[in-house]
Amino acid sequence: MSLEPLPGTLENLLEQTSLKWIFVGGKGGVGKTTTSCSLAIQMSKVRKSVLLISTDPAHNLSDAFGTKFGKEARLIPGFENLSAMEIDPNASIQEMLEQSEQQNPNNPMSGMMQDLAFAIPGIDEALAFAEVMKEVKSMNFDCVIFDTAPTGHTLRFLNFPTVLEKALAKLSGLTSRFGPLINQMSGMLGTNTNQEDIFAKMEGMRGSISEVNKQFKNPDLTTFVCVCISEFLSLYETERMIQELTSYEIDTHNIVVNQLLLDPDTKCPQCIARRKMQQKYLSQIEELYEDFHIVKVPQVPSEVRGTEALTKFSDLLIHPYVKE
């Protein structure tokens, strides 16, 4: 006997009051930003304060709401408890490096220390991620929703706490082995290197990053919403993403399938052909993910831009589509 399918809505996320971090991700062009903005609008109805944060360098939040956002959180016009910000992790790390150089412009050791620190793959992005998380945590939002970069970047982003923990462990070992040598060279060159400060700062991050890592792996606090369309490549990408999320021990139990042609009575030949293809892949999604909430969102007649259009669209995530 087959199990009753789970409700095809994201209402389960609104009801899970313990959730702190929600990631929304998928392939480019599947409606990921529209979905994350809409989810944030719904979440703001049941939470005290919500932050929507884009880690996608394309930064579509500003376009979606028709308001310019930057790296500082600011309220979205029309809301009292929903804020947004757009950050570029790569730009964040560049700022950190420039700051370090300004503090020690004539220190030949600082370049060497940076090279040593960034010799570990992924450490630059991971450090930038640590800075972002530190800032976000200090703002004390009730719930944080990440509109992530297209799939590949998303998964790297989620693995950063692990990368950083491993990197800090390696760097701690390097400090004990090469610290005296660097200090000796520093003395010979007549410079006052801040290598101890650099390592101390990184070591200081370890505790908070370890805490973030634990939170990301806790299904009571963190979940990932997959967004796709009912086509082969998108389905393949979603399957790969779910497998990787599972390997990172990150909870995922919601899939939003966008741009569906749900009207069976259409007379348009192209629509009939496309609907037939969509139904084929939708059946596969339902078969593969029977323990997921699969939200079927229809193709809407106009572009979803602006607060009013997003608010209207957000209802489709909570109330299953019914043909009028």
Swiss-Prot record:
It is an enzyme of class 3 (hydrolase). The active site is at residue 56. GO terms for cellular component: GET complex. Keywords: ATP-binding, Cytoplasm, Endoplasmic reticulum, Hydrolase, Metal-binding, Nucleotide-binding, Transport, Zinc. The keyword Isomerase does not apply. GO terms for molecular function: ATP binding; ATP hydrolysis activity; identical protein binding; metal ion binding. Its main location: cytoplasm. It comes from the Eukaryota. Zn(2+) binds at residues 268, 271. Its EC number is 3.6.-.-. GO terms for biological process: tail-anchored membrane protein insertion into ER membrane. The keyword Transport applies. It is found in: Cytoplasm; Endoplasmic reticulum. Homodimer. NCBIfam families: GET3_arsA_TRC40 (TIGR00345). This is ATPase get3. It comes from Schizosaccharomyces japonicus (strain yFS275 / FY16936) (Fission yeast).
